[in-house]
A protein has these predicted regions:
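A short glycine-rich, Lys/Arg-flanked "PGG" loop and its adjoining helix->strand segment in the class I
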Residues: 223-237
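Small-residue-mediated transmembrane helix hinge/kink sites in multi-pass secondary transporters
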Residues: 12-16
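Membrane-interfacial entry segments at the cytosolic side of transmembrane helices
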Residues: 42-55
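Conserved SAM-binding strand-loop segment of SAM-dependent methyltransferases
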Residues: 183-194
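Hydrophobic/small/kink-forming positions within alpha-helical transmembrane segments
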Residues: 5-9, 33
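A short acidic, Gly/Pro-enriched loop at the edge of an enzyme's catalytic core
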Residues: 199-209
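Class I S-adenosylmethionine
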Residues: 56-165, 170-181, 254, 259
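Conserved beta-strand signature within the Rossmann-like core of class I S-adenosyl-L-methionine
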Residues: 238-245
Length: 266
């Protein structure tokens, strides 16, 4: 029980935020080896496996340790970790791409030709149109799950009178947005949980994009009827909510179906 508690909370709140995942593995491997060493010495037993483990641990610490996970990548601009994510920024001839916790996925993209992204962000641009952005002097847009600001930048480009705010829980991703993705300086980004942010403000918006769902990783607090009611309360009378589910599954009983039913109940 004690080991389970330590193994759950110490990596989450101490070692991973302070040192990263690789060092965390080595720290806990060292602790296990130390406990094994104490046992075999106190029991006056000899164990070839323990000695081999110690040798292997030392070799990993001084010879095989690397901060880079994607050692095969040749086009990385940045690789690192945050409290929430493993982060990669890659560049090719046409794009700068952010990937989190995956080898091949794309969470944010910057097109070097300043055109459309070719991804779901382009479809989301229908939301300001439906909200009447062309006829309004100012269109207030809120992005919950701002990432590196792909949608925010597109709103500023194609709807010049839009005023965009972003909420992003991972402050390292926001830093990458400024360093590599040319996020507009006039996009205000708050480091906070999306639902908690809505609870803390009174402002209403023409468009709210909920972009916090990543594959099967769904913030439970942002997938309930109560959450979508909260979003609705922050929309203007003719406001539009857009949601990126980013998950496959068209059959009955899929998570998409359940979330659609939840939204439809509001």
């Amino acid at each position: 029980t004690i080991g389970s508690i330590i193994g759950t909370f110490v990596p989450t709140f101490v070692t991973i935020p302070a040192f990263g995942t690789s060092v965390t593995f080595l720290v806990f491997a060292g602790i296990l080896l130390l406990l094994a060493l104490i046992y075999f010495i106190s029991a006056k037993k000899r164990c070839v496996s323990l000695v081999s483990g110690i040798v292997l641990f030392v070799l990993c610490c001084f010879g095989g340790f690397s901060d880079s996970f994607a050692f095969w990548e040749t086009n990385l601009l940045y690789e690192g970790e945050s409290v929430y994510n493993y982060l990669q920024v890659k560049e090719d001839k046409e794009n700068v791409i952010l990937s989190t916790n995956v080898l091949f996925g794309v969470q944010s993209v910057l097109k070097k030709d300043a055109g459309l992204s070719g991804m779901y962000y382009d479809y989301m641009l229908a939301a300001p149109v439906l909200a009447g952005a062309q006829e309004k002097e100012k269109t207030d847009v809120l992005v919950l799950g701002n990432g590196t600001g792909t949608f925010a930048a597109q709103c500023r480009k194609f709807f010049s009178r839009s005023q965009v705010e972003g909420v992003e829980i991972d402050e390292k991703i926001t830093a990458l947005a400024k360093d590599y993705f040319q996020m507009p300086d006039d996009v205000k980004v708050t480091t906070y949980d999306g639902r908690a942010y809505l609870n803390a403000i009174d402002k209403t918006y023409d468009v709210i994009l909920v972009d916090a769902f990543q594959d099967i990783t769904i913030p439970f607090q942002m997938s309930s009827v109560e959450f979508f009611r909260l979003v609705k309360s922050h929309l203007k009378e003719d406001g539009v909510m857009a949601v990126n589910l980013n998950m496959r599954g068209d059959g009955g009983g899929s998570i998409n179906e359940y979330l659609s039913d939840t939204i439809g109940a509001v």
